[in-house]
Structures are given as structure tokens and as C-alpha cells.
Amino acid sequence: MSDATVAKKPRETDDVPVPPTLRKSLKNRHIQLIALGGAIGTGLFYGSSESIQLAGPAILLAYLIGGLAIFLIVRALSEMAVEDPKAGAFSYYATQYWSKRAGFISGWNYWFNYVLVAMVELAVVGSFVNYWFPNIPKWVSAVVFLVAIAALNLMGVNKFGEFEFWFAIIKIVAVLAMIFGGLYVIIANVPTASGIRASFANWFTVDGGFLPHGLMSSNADGTWTGLLMALVVVMFSFGGTELIGITAGETENPRTTIPKATNGIIWRILVFYICALGVIMAVIPWSTIDGNSSPFVQIFDSVGVHAAAGILNFVCLTAVMSVYNSGLYANSRMLYSLAKQGNAPAYLGRLNKRGVPVGGVITSAIIIAIAVVVVFVWPDFAFNYLMSIATIAAAINWIMIMITEIKFRRVVAAGDGPNDLKGLKGQEALDKLAFKLPFAKVTPYVVIAFMLLVVVLMCFSASYRIAVVAGVIWLVVLFAAYQITQKRA
């Protein structure tokens, strides 16, 4: 082959330097496991006790309803991501198909949400380390993990993907081991600590049956329980599932990988939440699960694995590192996207030779470090108020994704869709969408109504009521911040 037939690749030494770009280094196995592990966190291993107490065995129905809602949210996001894969995902889409203000609010809201989530995860990492090394100060553990994960994210997206892959494997193995251990207790009729025979019939026969608190019921202390109240806890246990959309801009083949990962969400929820909690409540009477110890530990104890507490501690430490790793990745890409849209300082949009937005990684890590200091100095303030904003921020994100999906389809139908869709109009354009949202004419409105119902239900709980008020204030702050930045522009 002659030199004339070979296209010369531009190099940095040529007259026109090649600017660095985001690397499409995330493979199918990375995306599948990131999606798989994203829905499994400390909330499943420890927080499931709270949701079980709210609804009893009916919590399974709550997870099914909430799981369907989150599946449709990610399907909407993935419809856009497959056609127009970009870093920052829904912030970019909100800017492109809705308005620059919407992109600003969506992006900064998501970034701050993950800063707060990462803050709390790092604040508790010391508790897990102290299980084995009680003399190590908790702040030392937080600093070590903060620096280590930040360094990992600076190495390149492939390193992030590889670590998330193995973090997810550890969590998945732990859940599957619990499920099979519980099934062994049921099938082999192993004696339980409660004296009640392990059986799936316990869902319907123990302490009030399947729906012990009804849809909603008020308690003597003024608190509310029931299936509807459990939906609040359930929905926010799915936080982070939308990370699939963020990864689209760095995925090798988003048109095949993203749909596979998205369609698997419903099965992951069925296996890792509904099956896991169903087995737990078949072995342990739901009314005895009080949060003093993880129900996972109780299952392992039942099959003779008395080192379960130590094993679960390791799994939870892994889950915490995974959340911070994912959070730092998502935040750096969101800041990169905001900078490219003109909604953040320009330095956040620069990449190093590995295709990493260094400014976004370092800036996010520094802000998270400051937030961790706040947690240690004013723990009550941090957990009661800052995390309230994180809670409502997730609801804001999901509602904005669905509104953006409505706007996206209108733009596509008008002939201004991205890439191959440009120029096509009406139903012809919509039919060309590669990964369509099911029942797209009504689905976004149904999901938005459902999320608004969840926000209303939050008002019935004293702790979540703070979140609703904080969320309104937070939106006002974002609106004001956008107006200020536009006047300075």
C-alpha cells in the first residue's frame, strides 16, 4: 500500500495540534456492572430495615412500583443518550432541547446532589475502618479514601470503569450469597432464632399479614407508616441509577451498550431488591427487623456464617468507596459539560492527555473535602439539613429528565433532531429513534405525576418535610445564580 493511500493522522507536532477528547474507553462489561452495582449500596444492606418497618412485606410491592418508575426515567434518558451520547447527559440535553437555564439548573443540581452524597459516604467510611482498626481517627480514613479515589479518577476513565467493575462484583456476590443462604434455610427447614418456621407464607401470616399498615396509617407519636410512605424511602434508594446516561459519552458503542444496561434495570431490581428482601422476610419475621443489626447478618448467622458482621462490614466499605468513586466521576463530567455549555468556568472544560477533566475532578474533590469537615464539626447540621437537599435534589433531577424527554421529542418531530435524525420530521423522525421510551406520549406525564406524589408524601414525615422546604429554597438559589451569571456574561 502506497503512502498516498494512507490517511495521515494529525499529531501534536503537526501545524494543527489535536485537542484532547473524552476517551471512549468504557466497555460493555464496565457499563453492565456499573449499572448493576449502581443500585446496590449501603441502603440495601442496612437501610432496608427502615423500609421494611414502614410497610412490612408490602415493601416488595413498593420496590416494584418504584423500580418501574426509575426504569422509565432511565429509559427516557437512554433514548436521548443513544441518539446523542454526550458527557453530562441530562444537563446537556436540557440545554440543547429545553433552555440554557434548564441545563444550568439540572447540571448544578445534580453536581451538588452528588457532592452531598459523597460527603456523607466519606464521613461514615471511618466507622467501617474502625471495625478492624478502632484506633484510627475517622477523619484520617476519610482523607485517605478521598485522596486515593481522586487519584484513581485522574488516571483515566478506564481505571474508573475497572474499579467500579470489581466493586460491583463484590456487592453482587454478597447479595446472591444472602439469597441462596436464605433459600437454604427455607428449603432445609433450618431452625430460626425467632422460633417461627422459615417460609414464604410468613409474608401473609406474620404480624398483620402482607399489608400490615395499609396504604397509609398514622401512629400515636404522629408518624406515618404504610405502603405509600415506604415509596419515599424506596425511590431514593435508587439514586445513582441514572449514571448510565452520564457514561454514554465515554462508552465504546453506546447504541448497543446503553440499551442493554438500561433494559437490565428491571431485572436487577427484581433480583437484588425484591428477591433479597423477600427471602429476608421469609426467614426473619418482618416485625423483628428493627435496624439494630443488618438483616443480611441475621441471614448469614442462620446458616452458620458467624463472621457475617465482618464480611458485611467489608462489603459496605466497598459500597461506600463505589459511591464516592461514581460520584466523583459523575461530578467531573457534569462540570465538564456545564463548562462546554457556558454554564461553568472554562477551566472545568479542559482535558488532560488521558482525556480526563482534571479541573472537574480536583474541584469536586476539594468541595467534598470541605463538606466532610462540615460533617465532623457540625454533624447534626450536615445530616439533617444538607442531606435533605440531596434527597429532594434527586426528585428534581428525575422530574427534569422527564420534562427534557418531552422537549427532546418535540425538537425531533420538528426536524431538528441530532445526527441522523436531522431533517426528518413528524412521526417519521420519531420512528427512527433507535431506543424508544415505551408509550412515550403518556409515560413522561405519568412519571412526573408519580414523582410529585412522592414529594407530597414527603411532607407527612418530619425529616423529609425539611427536605421539601430546602428543595424549594435550593431551586430559588439556582434560579438566582443563573440570572447573576447571565448578567455578568
Predicted regions and their residues:
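Helix-loop-helix connectors at the membrane interface of multi-pass transporters/channels
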Residues: 4, 15, 92-95, 101, ...
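Extracellular loop-to-transmembrane helix junctions
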Residues: 22-23, 46-141, 145, 265-268, ...
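C-terminal membrane-solvent junction of multi-pass transporters and transport-like membrane proteins
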Residues: 166-167, 347-358, 398-463, 488
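TM-loop-TM module centered on a large, flexible mid-protein loop between adjacent transmembrane helices
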Residues: 92-94, 99, 131, 205-219, ...
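A generic transmembrane alpha-helix motif of multi-pass inner-membrane proteins
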Residues: 185-186, 382-397, 437-489
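Hydrophobic alpha-helical segments and their helix-loop junctions in multi-pass secondary transporters
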Residues: 172-213, 279-284, 401-416, 462, ...
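Membrane-interface "cap" regions at the ends of multi-pass membrane proteins
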Residues: 1-48, 53-55, 71-75, 86-87, ...
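Membrane-helix boundary/coupling elements in multi-pass transport proteins
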Residues: 86, 109-124, 233-251, 309-346, ...
